[in-house]
Amino acid sequence: MYAVIKTGGKQYKVAVGEKLKVEQIPADIDAEITLDQVLAVGEGESIKFGTPLVSGASVKATVVSQGRHKKVTIFKMRRRKHYQKHGGHRQNYTELRIDAINA
């Protein structure tokens, strides 16, 4: 069984037992959270789409860790003008383990 969930403005296809990194969710480590924005639920050949959400469906997950992604380097340069600018960005994430899919 799998589900398509929406969190942090992105969509993820998840199955029970998977781990995934999503945009930061303010929760403690080992806390159980419920993701209610389920867009689709499928098992084998059958799939159920929501309009836009599947009514009564939810995904239970456990917070495994909180962290930061690797740095994305930004470099701006203007040729012949001796203008160079360095920058970087590290995005926060929450790692989840999917425990159950309720449809």
Curated annotation (Swiss-Prot):
One of its GO terms (molecular function) is rRNA binding. Belongs to the bacterial ribosomal protein bL21 family. Keywords: Ribonucleoprotein, Ribosomal protein, RNA-binding, rRNA-binding. One of its GO terms (biological process) is translation. InterPro entries: bL21-like, bL21-like_sf, Ribosomal_bL21, Ribosomal_bL21_CS. The keyword RNA-binding applies. It comes from the Bacteria. NCBIfam families: L21 (TIGR00061). GO terms for cellular component: cytoplasm; ribonucleoprotein complex; ribosome. Pfam families: Ribosomal_L21p. This is Large ribosomal subunit protein bL21. Part of the 50S ribosomal subunit. Contacts protein L20. This protein binds to 23S rRNA in the presence of protein L20. Transmembrane segments: none annotated. The gene is rplU.
